[in-house]
UniProtKB/Swiss-Prot annotation:
Gene: MT-ND4L
Pfam families for the chain: Oxidored_q2
Record's protein name: NADH-ubiquinone oxidoreductase chain 4L
Assigned GO CC terms: mitochondrial inner membrane; respiratory chain complex I
Transmembrane stretches, start-end: 2-22, 29-49, 61-81
Organism encoding this protein: Microcebus griseorufus
Protein task: Core subunit of the mitochondrial membrane respiratory chain NADH dehydrogenase (Complex I) which catalyzes electron transfer from NADH through the respiratory chain, using ubiquinone as an electron acceptor. Part of the enzyme membrane arm which is embedded in the lipid bilayer and involved in proton translocation.
Disulfide-bonded cysteines: none
Enzyme Commission identifier(s): 7.1.1.2
Cell compartments where the protein resides: Mitochondrion inner membrane
């Protein structure tokens, strides 16, 4: 495995560990999620370019579309929660609260 793939895999792992460690605040979770999506995009693009599999050139573009939708929904949810509660804690998203 080339060193660039190892570095991108380490970036994905670091973003995943950041997501697990800083899961109490929504903004840090969204940033870690974006880091994971970016590393997945770069890794999938490198794999497609190395294997020259022409039928899957659309996959990185679809991944970017889903990442943009995820970011937009996440930021809208962050604005809604911060306007309602004044905090960005994920514990405010509990649907069982009355």
């Amino acid at each position: 495995m080339p060193s660039i793939s190892i570095n991108i895999t380490l970036a994905f792992t670091a973003a995943l560990l950041g997501m697990l460690m800083f899961r109490s605040h929504m903004m840090s979770s969204l940033l870690c999620l974006e880091g994971m999506m970016l590393s997945m995009f770069i890794l999938s693009t490198l794999i497609i370019l190395n294997t020259q599999f022409t039928m899957s050139f659309i996959m990185p573009i679809l991944l970017l579309v889903f990442a943009a939708c995820e970011a937009a929904i996440g930021l809208a949810l962050l604005v809604m929660v911060s306007n309602t509660y004044g905090l960005d804690h994920i514990q405010n998203l509990n649907l069982l609260q009355c």
